[in-house]
C-alpha cells in the first residue's frame, strides 16, 4: 500500500506541475521529443544536467522523477527503483538499469572548451576526443553511468 501511496503522490505532483486541468492539458506539446534516462539518484542527476550541461529543471517530484529541458528536447529522469512505472520489472523479470550506449547528443561550438570546463568540474569521461567525418565528439557519463555525447560539427556551426 505504501508503494501505491507514493505513486499517487508522484502522479499528483506531476499533474500539478503540468497544470493538469482540461483547459491546460491542451497546452502540452505532443510534438516535443522526450528521452527517459533511468538513474540511481534523481537529485544528483538533476544537479549534473543543470550545472554541467545547461538543462533547465521543468519539475521535480522528490527522489522519484524529474523533467528537464534544453532546446526542443525534454529529458525525463526516473530512478532504477521506486514506485513509478519506469522502474517496474519487465515480464521476463529484467529490471531497468542506468548506463548503456544509447545517448543524448549535446552540440557545442567549442568542444575543447567544454572538455576543459567539465574536466575541472570532475565529470567522468569515457574516452578522449574522437575526430569523425561529421565532427568531433567525446562521451561523458552522468552520475548514474548514462552516456552523454558532446559533439562539435566539422564546420563549427551548431545546428539551429
Question: Could you tell me what each predicted segment is?
Answer:
Residues 14-21:
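C-terminal segment of classical bacterial N-terminal signal peptides
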Amino acid at each position: 500500500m505504501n508503494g501505491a501511496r507514493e505513486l499517487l503522490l508522484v502522479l499528483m505532483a506531476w499533474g500539478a506541475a503540468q497544470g493538469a486541468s482540461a483547459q491546460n492539458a491542451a497546452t502540452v506539446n505532443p510534438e516535443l521529443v522526450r528521452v527517459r534516462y533511468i538513474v540511481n539518484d534523481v537529485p544528483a542527476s538533476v544537479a549534473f544536467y543543470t550545472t554541467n550541461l545547461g538543462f533547465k529543471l521543468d519539475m521535480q517530484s522528490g527522489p522519484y522523477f524529474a523533467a528537464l529541458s534544453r532546446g526542443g528536447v525534454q529529458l525525463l529522469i526516473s530512478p532504477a527503483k521506486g514506485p513509478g512505472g519506469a522502474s517496474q520489472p519487465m515480464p521476463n523479470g529484467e529490471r531497468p538499469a542506468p548506463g548503456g550506449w544509447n545517448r543524448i547528443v549535446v552540440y557545442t561550438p567549442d568542444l575543447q572548451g567544454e572538455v576543459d570546463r567539465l574536466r575541472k568540474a570532475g565529470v567522468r569521461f569515457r574516452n578522449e576526443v574522437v575526430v569523425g567525418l561529421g565532427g568531433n565528439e567525446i562521451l561523458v557519463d552522468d552520475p548514474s553511468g548514462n552516456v552523454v555525447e558532446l559533439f562539435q560539427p566539422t564546420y563549427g556551426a551548431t545546428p539551429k
